[in-house]
Amino acid sequence: FKTIKFDSPSLGKPLPEYLILIKTKNHLARIMHIEPSVKRGDEIHLGDEIGRFINNGYFFFWVDAGMHVEVRDLNDYLRARGGYELMPMFASKITEERPVSELKGTVIDASKRNITVKLNKNNVVKIKDNYSLMDCATSLGYGGVLGKFNPEDEIYFNGIKIGKIDRIGNYMSTFKTEKLKVLVNGIGFRGISFIFGREIAKLLPKRYGKPALKKGDKVNIKLKRQEK
């Protein structure tokens, strides 16, 4: 249907952003953060390559490249808001995840941006008597959980309070995080990022550069609430 190129927030050098619009009947797939290899009028099929991932001024240095996808009406693709809400389908119920005595893991990837760790537990959180999955980068100050909960409900991960519910959607809730210290093998990190439904986390360094850990390292992770 169309591709659009425009400027992203500046990081001291020209960093373009791209908008790819793919038409299907009466709707558009709106895709950002991909430099297109397709052009207007190309026919796209499931599995086709459409471009390459980019990093620009919309990304913190510790964020890996990724794309943003929305489903929009044909004539409503430039506004920041307006995408259709997508409802997730669950294959099974989220069940209790018992706390582990120590949060441990193994480094499976290390880059100048972040360090990926395979954990010894899932990212299941406890909210009162319920259990949910979270998506959260602690350094951003907010996160999300699947399910509708009540404002001010407290969220616990591995027995540690990490935040409170502040907004409720149709199938999810967002929460404000506590101020947390992240220590890994005694090394301080900016934060930790969890991924929905996986025993995977990313350690977010305080600055871009040579990683403090390497692939294969065994780690002990401590999350501590900062004193106010």
Describe each region flagged by the PLM:
Residues F1-K228:
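Contiguous, well-folded functional domains in the mature portion of proteins
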